[in-house]
Amino acid sequence: MAKIYATGKRKTAIAKVWLTPGSGKLTVNGTTLNDWLGGHEAIKMKVMQPLLLTKQEKSVDIVSVTLGGGYSAQAEALRHGISKALSAYDIAFRAILKPKGLLTRDSRVVERKKYGKRKARRSPQFSKR
């Protein structure tokens, strides 16, 4: 089977994911997942969630490149990309991943700053006198 390509997004982070049948290696930006995260278990579980749900953690190799955003947003973008790649790999996985919301793009992004305001919604301090 050929390589399967998918992209995942979250906030301003983008993850490009290539999935191939293999032994379960997961490479992010040229390093292993543990090195990339610095041993952060909660974020690691978030990234591994689609693989664990479909029981593919030992049967596919994943190579990915992430850019933009912070670690948490990159991890969620990576999870989104892995989910999309798995659903392209086997259509049966779609029925497992879709109810968990892993194929849905989280559209929440930072609200823009408005003129006359200090931030998106914070107004300057009001003085009555």
UniProtKB/Swiss-Prot annotation:
One of its GO terms (cellular component) is cytosolic small ribosomal subunit. InterPro entries: Ribosomal_Su5_D2-typ_SF (IPR020568), Ribosomal_uS9 (IPR000754), Ribosomal_uS9_bac/plastid (IPR023035), Ribosomal_uS9_CS (IPR020574), Ribsml_uS5_D2-typ_fold_subgr (IPR014721). One of its GO terms (molecular function) is structural constituent of ribosome. The keyword Ribonucleoprotein applies. Gene3D superfamilies: 3.30.230.10. It comes from the Bacteria. It holds the Pfam family Ribosomal_S9. Disulfide bonds: none annotated. GO terms for biological process: translation. Keywords: Ribonucleoprotein, Ribosomal protein. NCBIfam families: PRK00132.1 (NF001099). Belongs to the universal ribosomal protein uS9 family. This is Small ribosomal subunit protein uS9.
